[in-house]
Amino acid sequence: MAVAIAAARVWRLNRGLSQAALLLLRRPGARGLARSHPRRQQQQFSSLDDKPQFPGASAEFIDKLEFIQPNVISGIPIYRVMDRQGQIINPSEDPHLPKEKVLKLYKSMTLLNTMDRILYESQRQGRISFYMTNYGEEGTHVGSAAALDNTDLVFGQYREAGVLMYRDYPLELFMAQCYGNISDLGKGRQMPVHYGCKERHFVTISSPLATQIPQAVGAAYAAKRANANRVVICYFGEGAASEGDAHAGFNFAATLECPIIFFCRNNGYAISTPTSEQYRGDGIAARGPGYGIMSIRVDGNDVFAVYNATKEARRRAVAENQPFLIEAMTYRIGHHSTSDDSSAYRSVDEVNYWDKQDHPVSRLRHYLLSQGWWDEEQEKAWRKQSRKKVMEAFEQAERKPKPNPNLLFSDVYQEMPAQLRKQQESLARHLQTYGEHYPLDHFDK
């Protein structure tokens, strides 16, 4: 009986939070997410003996044994602004972005697409060691980035290059990082696509899944303590949401009331594992209410829906000091990485459908064409220009040498300890003796 009562109590609490999270604000000028901390109706009790006294939950008693079925709550709806033809569905949800901003969204997405194609092919030619494309997910990157303040701190996973692209991170630095040359801010110590930029408030990417989530919560808590008037946004995939760090991060953010946006890119696959084998519940957004986090599910291929949800979440996270969870539904058109062959676990027809029928770049292009802000001649000219820009940065990066091997020992301690100094001297002796066996001419002197 106690188990049934507890289950009913949790279900009713979650149902109330979920419904509150999904209601769009209807007052003039407001969009996106519902008001936080909905006021509950006070239940009347004839005596104190009837009133629940449990400190861990606030709920009513029931007198019938009833286990809560996992499918008793209908699926969380997907918020969208544009249909697949780029037409605004509900005029009241149109963000009315100026032409210049929409063009920046489009050019950031297409420039990222061009860079992906060139760097993917360069890996296949053996010019770089590894790469991960962003095909199909460009809208989640730039739509969210456009809604943030440039000083908001970003914790990425590994497929958020578009956020940096929107923040005008130079193509030369993208290329330098992938080549690991002397212009790489990380001095060639990281795998390709592990970008980071202090000036653009983008924390360097780390390979282990979900480690960035509790770290981002800590940064958000620090921002709150400092009254910094900024948010932290943390990106991750639906696969990473199954890691223990994700759940710890969600709970910390909720209990410490941190100004953070958890942005989940649900692209259908955790490497080769489809969502049908990852979870049995209603995706990732459904987990938010259980932690007391305001949540919403959006069409990740609709850049305006992503923009609206992120903008409203940011506004309220700063004003109310509370976390928000956005689940952006999208599709990973490319392979997981250059180490993956997705044809082993999904059909070509499936990939072609998303590439041809529901691509975020195509949807935004339809919108631009309908507004008279873009035409086929501009499209051809921009594609040619963007490829030229990427190729120039690519060729420049390829010509630059790798960092000096001595830099392996720097940036660890302010003053190098004796043991590390011995290792540095040992490497120098080894290279002096056997240098002809290494491509030292590729390294900076």
Swiss-Prot record:
Catalytic activity: N(6)-[(R)-lipoyl]-L-lysyl-[protein] + 3-methyl-2-oxobutanoate + H(+) = N(6)-[(R)-S(8)-2-methylpropanoyldihydrolipoyl]-L-lysyl-[protein] + CO2
Residues annotated as binding thiamine diphosphate: Y158, R159, S207, G239, A240, R265, H336
Transit peptide: first to last position: 1-45
Name the UniProt record assigns to this protein: 2-oxoisovalerate dehydrogenase subunit alpha, mitochondrial
Subunit structure: Heterotetramer of 2 alpha/BCKDHA and 2 beta chains/BCKDHB that forms the branched-chain alpha-keto acid decarboxylase (E1) component of the BCKD complex. The branched-chain alpha-ketoacid dehydrogenase is a large complex composed of three major building blocks E1, E2 and E3. It is organized around E2, a 24-meric cubic core composed of DBT, to which are associated 6 to 12 copies of E1, and approximately 6 copies of the dehydrogenase E3, a DLD dimer. Interacts with PPM1K.
Pfam families linked to this entry: E1_dh (PF00676)
One Gene Ontology MF term: metal ion binding
GO annotation, biological process: branched-chain amino acid catabolic process
Function: Together with BCKDHB forms the heterotetrameric E1 subunit of the mitochondrial branched-chain alpha-ketoacid dehydrogenase (BCKD) complex. The BCKD complex catalyzes the multi-step oxidative decarboxylation of alpha-ketoacids derived from the branched-chain amino-acids valine, leucine and isoleucine producing CO2 and acyl-CoA which is subsequently utilized to produce energy. The E1 subunit catalyzes the first step with the decarboxylation of the alpha-ketoacid forming an enzyme-product intermediate.
Record's GO cellular component terms: branched-chain alpha-ketoacid dehydrogenase complex; mitochondrial matrix
Cofactor(s) needed: thiamine diphosphate; Mg(2+)
Keyword Magnesium: yes
Organism ancestry: Eukaryota, Metazoa, Chordata, Craniata, Vertebrata
